[in-house]
Amino acid sequence: MLGAAGLAMAAYAGCVRPRLMRWGATDDEVAGPYPGADVVPKGQRGPTMAVTIDAPPDEVWPWLVQMGGDRGGWYSWDRLDNGGRPSAREVHPEWQDLAVGDYVKYWRGSQGAVDAWQVALLEPNRFLGLHGLTDLRLHNLDPNQPRPHAYTEGLWGFLLNELPGGRTRLVIGGYEAVRPRWLGRLYSYTPVVWIMQARTMSVLKRNVEHAAQART
């Protein structure tokens, strides 16, 4: 049993995990520059996932800025991350006003800045960066204060690169840090990240392309 478990773990680490860490992304998208490195001090690149959307960046952007548990949802598995409430299937004007410093709730009904991402970077039609910093009890911390001995931190980024033919390359990536460092080696969020983010990319692509086709 232990031998089989060890082989399974080795196979995951050697074959499966590397694929999940760069799902759909090119070598340049994985290794090249990505916005937000300065937001997570001493952080390292996290998983990078990418997809091509048959619509220009200005038609993808409205779907990104309306994300959130208290807004349009996360376009993922709604029973798991949106309380069973369906994510938005159209662009909502009331959720388009997003600015640096705003909080985007994880779940509907969470209070204040607790259980929320903070908008750290925002360049319309180009990049949205959501920042999270918590202690090990998942209580939000002030990024303007010195980091404690133990914490988790991450930047969740959505980069839109314009392609010829009115298309967009959506590259989801970012940076992460876990302290103490040994704690980070005990956890592997990659399968969970892949399951949820792969769904987000698929639904975003479908929604944006359907909306673009409806306008033609």
Q: Which residue ranges define each predicted feature?
A:
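Membrane-penetrating hydrophobic segments
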Residues: 1-2
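Intrinsic-disorder/low-complexity, polar/charged segments enriched in Ser/Thr/Lys/Arg/Asp/Glu/Gln
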Residues: 10, 46-52, 127, 153-155, ...
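A short, structured loop/turn motif at beta-sheet edges
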Residues: 54-58, 119-128, 159-169, 206-212
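Hydrophobic ligand-binding cavity/cleft-lining segments
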Residues: 6-107, 207, 214-216
